[in-house]
Swiss-Prot record:
Protein name: Small ribosomal subunit protein uS5
UniProt keyword annotation of Ribosomal protein present: yes
SUPFAM superfamilies recorded: dsRNA-binding domain-like, Ribosomal protein S5 domain 2-like
UniProt superkingdom: Bacteria
Domain topic, free-text comment: The N-terminal domain interacts with the head of the 30S subunit; the C-terminal domain interacts with the body and contacts protein S4. The interaction surface between S4 and S5 is involved in control of translational fidelity.
Subunit-level organization: Part of the 30S ribosomal subunit. Contacts proteins S4 and S8.
The species this protein was found in: Bartonella henselae (strain ATCC 49882 / DSM 28221 / CCUG 30454 / Houston 1) (Rochalimaea henselae)
Its job: With S4 and S12 plays an important role in translational accuracy.
A GO CC term assigned to this protein in UniProt: small ribosomal subunit
PANTHER family per the UniProt record, alphabetical: MITOCHONDRIAL RIBOSOMAL PROTEIN S5 (PTHR48277:SF1)
Gene3D superfamilies reported in the protein's UniProt record: 3.30.160.20, 3.30.230.10
Domain S5 DRBM: 16-79
């Protein structure tokens, strides 16, 4: 019975893709010298619009990564994607001194982003996006700022409802702008 439950849990967890973003060696000074530990930052996603990040600390690297992965799975968010590949609109996110700018991109552009942001977009399942990090380059700040931006994204249906207009009207305006650009 326990074997069956364990295999079912492993199948559910195998649907997630995880990326190690950053490992930091930390030291605690004690009477006998220094006691070393590790802190890990991990991003986990299902490549279908759900993503989360986690921070784990332990005396050994694998244990820190495991704790960070568990934390990331507990704090996952859903991000609506346009055509399953990019953002619905441009976004900006902040955390501390970190600021990120995320822009939707046309098909075939790819993921143009650096470091921690690239890991987030890959695990999220996003295929076309342009991202720029402004301010702090600390991986923790960049990840939190990116998540802040992703949480601000709204589906066009929600925007139309908020403005009190029809979804089709909003789509027509968007198409008009796309035609004017091209």
């Amino acid at each position: 019975m326990a074997q069956k439950e364990r295999s079912e849990r492993d199948e559910r967890e195998s649907e997630f893709v995880d990326r190690l973003v950053h490992i930091n060696r930390v030291a605690k000074v004690v009477k006998g010298g220094r006691r070393f530990g590790f802190a890990a930052l991990v991003v986990v996603g299902d490549q279908k619009g759900r993503v989360g990040f986690g921070h784990g600390k332990a005396r050994e690297v694998p244990e820190a990564v495991r704790k960070a992965t568990e934390s990331a799975k507990r704090g996952m968010i859903y991000v609506p994607l346009r055509s399953g590949r990019t953002l619905h609109h441009d976004l900006e996110g902040h955390h501390g001194a970190g600021r990120v700018l995320l822009r939707s991109a046309s098909a075939g552009t790819g993921i143009i982003a650096g470091g921690p942001m690239r890991a987030i977009f890959e695990t999220l399942g996003m295929q076309d996006v342009v991202a720029k990090s402004l301010g702090s380059s600390n991986p923790y700040n960049m990840v939190r700022a990116t998540f802040d931006a992703l949480k601000r994204q709204m589906h066009p249906r929600d925007i139309a409802a908020q403005r009190g207009i029809k979804y089709s009207t909003l789509q027509a305006r968007r198409q008009h702008l796309v035609d004017a650009e091209g």
